[in-house]
């Protein structure tokens, strides 16, 4: 029988392996995603972010890093988590169905050149899929954070979008990588804005 200590140690070991596997395929796309967001922000655009459950928390975490700060003081950056307005979420969900809670907000707030960050560990979340469709209708760019094989979202992205797919089967490890990717993108954005990299 495995002890609790061994279980915890196994989580650390698996998390390290998952990050090492992700590093092999995600460094360049992460830079591309950060550059896409920088281009948007420097052209007075905004970033909209969405996801469900833990991915909703990641969307909010990302928006907070942008509007507040990541690690260094800098100007505020326009980012909105579409997961936080309970009145909008419940009204849209009640009147149109849960699949449309993000897409209706994307159509209301998104403009050409803006960026949607859609987060789904499976790549198959119906309301994130609808948000991606709405973003494309608005001529927005999409950065998709997914896992496993990327799901339906990976298949619907355009050449001008960026896929950050964590090639790992376990949801917890995908989520840990998603927050790492979010922090890495925030760092890239800050390094360009503050240090001119």
Curated annotation (Swiss-Prot):
- This chain's protein is named Phosphoheptose isomerase
Superkingdom is: Bacteria
Database matches in PROSITE patterns: SIS
- Provide the SIS domain boundaries: 37-197
Instruction: Give one GO molecular function term.
Output: D-sedoheptulose 7-phosphate isomerase activity
Which cell locations does it reside in? Cytoplasm
Q: What is its EC number?
A: 5.3.1.28
Question: What functional role does this protein have?
Answer: Catalyzes the isomerization of sedoheptulose 7-phosphate in D-glycero-D-manno-heptose 7-phosphate.
* Primary location: cytoplasm
Report quaternary structure and partners: Homotetramer.
| Species of the source | Neisseria meningitidis serogroup C (strain 053442)
Catalytic activity, per the record? 2 D-sedoheptulose 7-phosphate = D-glycero-alpha-D-manno-heptose 7-phosphate + D-glycero-beta-D-manno-heptose 7-phosphate
Details of cofactor binding: Binds 1 zinc ion per subunit.
Q: Any other noteworthy remark?
A: The reaction produces a racemic mixture of D-glycero-alpha-D-manno-heptose 7-phosphate and D-glycero-beta-D-manno-heptose 7-phosphate.
The positions annotated for binding Zn(2+) are 61, 65, 175, 183
Q: Which GO terms describe its biological process?
A: carbohydrate metabolic process; D-glycero-D-manno-heptose 7-phosphate biosynthetic process
NCBIfam families according to UniProt? gmhA, PRK13936.1
Please state which protein family the record places this protein in.
Belongs to the SIS family. GmhA subfamily.
Which GO terms of the cellular component aspect does the record hold? Answer: cytoplasm
Keywords of the record:
Carbohydrate metabolism, Cytoplasm, Isomerase, Metal-binding, Zinc
So, what pathway does this thing act in? Carbohydrate biosynthesis; D-glycero-D-manno-heptose 7-phosphate biosynthesis; D-glycero-alpha-D-manno-heptose 7-phosphate and D-glycero-beta-D-manno-heptose 7-phosphate from sedoheptulose 7-phosphate: step 1/1
The positions annotated for binding substrate are: 52-54, 65, 94-95, 120-122, 125, 175
């Amino acid at each position: 029988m495995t002890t609790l200590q061994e279980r915890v140690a196994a989580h650390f070991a698996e998390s390290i392996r998952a990050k090492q596997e992700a590093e092999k395929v995600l460094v360049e796309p992460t830079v591309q995603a950060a550059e896409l967001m920088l281009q948007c922000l420097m052209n007075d655009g905004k970033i909209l972010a969405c996801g469900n459950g833990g991915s909703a928390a990641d969307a909010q975490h990302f928006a907070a890093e942008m509007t507040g700060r990541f690690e260094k003081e800098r100007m505020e950056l326009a980012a909105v988590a579409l997961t936080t307005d309970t009145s909008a979420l419940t009204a849209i969900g009640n009147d149109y169905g849960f699949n449309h809670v993000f897409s209706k907000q994307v159509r209301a707030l998104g403009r050409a050149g803006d960026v949607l960050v859609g987060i789904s560990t499976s790549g198959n979340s119906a309301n994130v899929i609808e948000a991606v469709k709405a973003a494309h209708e608005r001529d927005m760019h999409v950065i998709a954070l997914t896992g496993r094989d990327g799901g339906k979202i990976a298949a619907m992205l355009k050449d001008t979008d960026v896929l950050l797919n964590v090639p790992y089967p376990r949801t917890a490890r995908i989520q840990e990588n998603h927050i790492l990717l979010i922090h890495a993108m925030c760092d890239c954005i800050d390094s360009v804005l503050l240090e001119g990299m």
